[in-house]
Amino acid sequence: MPPAVTRETLGAWLLKANPAVWDVRRFRAEGHTRLTSWSVQRGYRTGLMRPGDRVVFWLSGPGTGDLVRGVWGLGHVVGEAEAWQDTDPGWWLDDAARQALRARVDVDVPLLDHPLPAADLRSAGITDLEVQRVPQMSNPSWVSRAQLDLLADLLPAWPDPPRAR
């Protein structure tokens, strides 16, 4: 079976957060407005991640209250995925999930002022994103170039990639 994603088909990486596992409310309440790294599952996909690749940050879960399921951030990969063990509880609500991590990737993903709800994607006819079809899949998920083109009308302007240091 060929890989689901290749460098040629990739539009953006999609990184998911489950609010039952990672405390997005507290993260925001503490004044954070951007993600600088995210946990990923080691595998062929993390081997494909490159600095400059686009990133969509997706909040999963039931989508109730102010934690609407959908797109919460847009940005870029800024470093290669690397082996990693998270020893800081940080915003984790599920310690077993935190301890199960084995890799992370550095990103620059500003959070959106107004998340784009998954329901708005469905209303626009966007129903075949991997995160919609297989929501329990581990990070990273992905969005094809064609799917990203369809999303463009619903999303705010993509931020510029950060400058190299």
PLM regions: where:
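Aromatic- and Lys/Arg-enriched surface recognition patch
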Residues: 68-70, 76-142
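Short coil-to-beta transition motif at edge beta-strands of beta-rich domains
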Residues: 46-63
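Beta-strand-rich binding-surface signature
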Residues: 12, 54, 102
